[in-house]
Amino acid sequence: MRIERDIDFGRPRRMRCGRCGHEELVSHDWMESWEQCNELCPECGIDCTEEDRARPTYDPDDPAIVDHQVLRMFWYHTSTIPDWPQKEFDPREKLTPETVQCMTRMLGAGAVDRWTEQQKSKALHVGTYEAAIENMLRRMADQPEGDAPFYLYRVVLDDAVGIEPGVHREPTNWVGDAQPEKFLTPGHSVYRYINEREDEGSISLALTADAIESVSGIQIPVATKTPARKKQRLATWQDVQLKVKEASVPDRVRPRLAGAFRPVSASNTDHLNLDLLDGLVDLIQDPSHILALLDSVEPRQV
């Protein structure tokens, strides 16, 4: 029996001070104030500018710290790739001739081939449902891919894979890639880390493709259950913010939800309609509807 964890985008977050070790559950308001240097560690008094400042950490009761529980859980991932994880793909397809020339000039002969192999061998990432949805919102804001649709994948791990002991810091480099040989020891395919960017304090996994048994995927956002209506365009950034403010979602998610619309709103060339906003809100406020859709999909063996 697989474990489906409770989904709560608005739950309190656990913070741990890197200097004194103090841990405390805090609200979204506290975290927002902390990031603006308006809060101090209640034990040692440092603020967010210090290298060993307080950071999100995992709950000591999180079942993901127990190896056999990790293998029984559903994990999630969002991607614009319709058949993730791909077995056969050529990363060079996304490179323009100008990029290839630049890489060769700056990094020498064979640079493109080396980069290609790194892209093919880099770790895959899965996490909580909340982390997967928030990752999609961040990518929509920071790495817009035009009209490329997103897919939500529910991931089942192979029961026989080895899990690296402990829960660690995220092993990615400055562009978000992680090479398994740098953090996985022989016999292990799964690496737990604290996610500090999405669903802060949750445990995510960096893993190799052979750790995955199967995936079930749906395109998101899905059609909402709101009544049919005439298309209404979001003409300005202020319109987007107002609609997000009216949405029934936790405060901590509102900036991320609005941020997903910023690139298109700022360009003023292609305005998003309310159906997309309703669909994104539905992913957050009615996850049971989304999980039911995933239940209806035949898992694909990897």
Give the predicted meaning of each segment.
Residues 69-93, 99-104, 148-302:
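Active-site and NAD+-binding cores of ADP-ribose-processing enzymes
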Residues 21-26, 48:
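Cys/His-rich microdomains that often coordinate metals
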Residues 9-13, 37, 109-185:
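ADP-ribosyltransferase catalytic core
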Residues 17-20, 41-44:
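Short cysteine-rich clusters marking metal-coordination/redox-active sites
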Residues 45-58:
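Short metal-binding segments enriched for Cys and/or His
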Residues 28-38:
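Short linker/helix segments within small regulatory modules
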Residues 61-125, 129, 133-142:
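Glycine-rich loop/turn
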